């Protein structure tokens, strides 16, 4: 059994998974909202690197009220378009992740940035949402 925590849309890592006849257990966050090391992720795609860098710096400096206000401002300019762009970026990342994962027996538990509804649209006989379930594992044949 292979355990992965926080995929964060790291496709190059997922492509290195060994093909074994046992489950891959993923503990949350299949998508990358913001990578606090370099600013990559959905927020950068939608709001631009400059805004994401500001958000990262405000977080590092514990200036949470200013950070909250910046988020509000970013969402206030054309909210319908922003929400559509966010949704499209989220769906794109899940599509890329699950394109790789469908080759494996996967048990996933959604993380705090994950969209359970979208994730569940990718479930199949080999890809399962096991959040809140008790799983007893025996070798797959």
Spans of model-derived segments:
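Active-site-proximal beta-strand elements of phosphoester/diester hydrolases
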Residues: 1-8, 141
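Core catalytic region of metal-dependent phosphoesterases/phosphodiesterases
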Residues: 9-140
């Amino acid at each position: 059994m292979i355990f992965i925590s926080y995929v964060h849309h790291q496709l190059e890592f997922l492509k290195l998974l060994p093909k074994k006849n046992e489950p891959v257990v993923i503990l949350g966050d299949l998508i990358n909202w913001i990578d606090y090391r370099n600013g990559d992720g959905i927020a950068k795609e939608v709001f631009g690197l400059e805004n994401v860098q500001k958000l990262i710096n405000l977080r590092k400096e514990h200036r949470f009220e200013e950070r909250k206000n910046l988020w509000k401002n970013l969402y206030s300019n054309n909210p319908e378009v922003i929400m559509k762009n966010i949704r499209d970026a989220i769906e794109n990342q899940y599509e890329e992740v699950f394109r790789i994962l469908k080759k494996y027996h996967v048990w996933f538990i959604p993380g705090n940035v994950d969209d359970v509804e979208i994730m569940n649209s990718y479930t199949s006989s080999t890809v399962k949402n096991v959040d809140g379930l008790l799983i007893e594992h025996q070798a797959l044949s």
